[in-house]
C-alpha cells in the first residue's frame, strides 16, 4: 500500500472518527437534554404536588371554617327555637290557668243566687259635718226630731247626693 492509500484510509478513518465523535456528542447532548427535561419534569411534578397539597389544605381549612360557622348558626337557631318553645309552653300554661279560672268563676256564678235589689238609700253629704237623724220606731207618737250636728255647727252648703247600694 502506498502512502496515498494509507493517507486516504487514515483520512476516511479520521472522518469516520469525527462522525462518530459528532454522533456521540449529539447523543450525549440529547441525553443531557433528556436528563434536564426529566429533572425539569420532576421539579414541575414536585411543584404541582406542593401546589395540590397547599390547595387541598386551603380547601380543607375553608371547609372546616364554614362547617364551624354553620354549626354555630345551627346552635344559635336551636337556642332560639328552644327559647321560643319555652315561651310557647309558658303561654300555654298561663292560658290553661286562665281557662281554669274562667271555668271556676262560671261555675261559682252559676251556683250563687241572684242578689235581691237593694232599695235606694238617701245620704246627705256635708263638707265638714255629718247630720244623723234618729227616729223612733213609731214616728206617729212623737214629734219630728231636729237633726243633731255631730261635727261643728255649720249649715248645710252642699247639695244632697243620692247613692244606690249595689
From Swiss-Prot:
CC per GO annotation: virion component
Keyword Oxidoreductase in annotation: no
Disordered: annotated span: 134-166
Keywords carried by this UniProt record: Viral genome packaging, Viral release from host cell, Virion
BP-aspect Gene Ontology terms: viral DNA genome packaging
Chief location category: virion
Subcellular location: Virion
Subunit structure comment from the entry: Heterodimer of P6 and P9; further multimerizes as hexamers of heterodimers. Part of the dodecameric portal complex that is composed of the packaging efficiency factor P6, the DNA packaging ATPase P9, and the internal heterododecamer P20/P22 which spans the virion inner membrane.
Task performed by this protein: Together with the packaging ATPase P9, forms the external part of the portal vertex that is embeded in the capsid and which plays critical roles in genome packaging and genome ejection. Both proteins multimerize as a single ring-shaped heterdodecamer arranged around a central channel.
Name of the protein in its database record: Packaging efficiency factor P6
Amino acid at each position: 500500500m502506498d502512502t496515498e492509500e494509507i493517507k486516504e484510509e487514515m483520512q476516511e478513518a479520521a472522518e469516520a472518527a469525527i462522525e462518530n465523535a459528532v454522533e456521540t456528542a449529539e447523543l450525549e447532548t440529547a441525553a443531557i437534554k433528556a436528563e434536564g427535561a426529566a429533572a425539569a419534569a420532576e421539579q414541575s411534578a414536585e411543584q404541582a404536588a406542593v401546589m395540590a397539597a397547599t390547595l387541598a389544605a386551603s380547601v380543607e381549612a375553608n371547609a372546616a371554617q364554614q362547617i364551624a360557622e354553620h354549626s354555630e348558626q345551627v346552635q344559635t337557631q336551636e337556642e332560639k327555637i328552644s327559647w321560643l318553645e319555652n315561651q310557647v309552653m309558658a303561654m300555654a300554661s298561663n292560658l290553661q290557668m286562665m281557662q281554669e279560672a274562667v271555668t271556676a268563676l262560671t261555675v261559682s256564678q252559676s251556683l250563687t243566687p241572684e242578689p235581691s235589689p237593694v232599695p235606694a238609700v238617701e245620704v246627705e253629704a256635708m263638707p265638714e259635718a255629718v247630720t244623723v237623724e234618729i227616729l223612733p220606731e213609731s214616728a206617729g207618737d212623737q214629734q219630728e226630731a231636729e237633726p243633731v250636728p255631730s261635727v261643728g255647727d255649720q249649715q248645710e252648703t252642699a247639695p244632697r247626693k243620692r247613692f244606690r247600694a249595689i
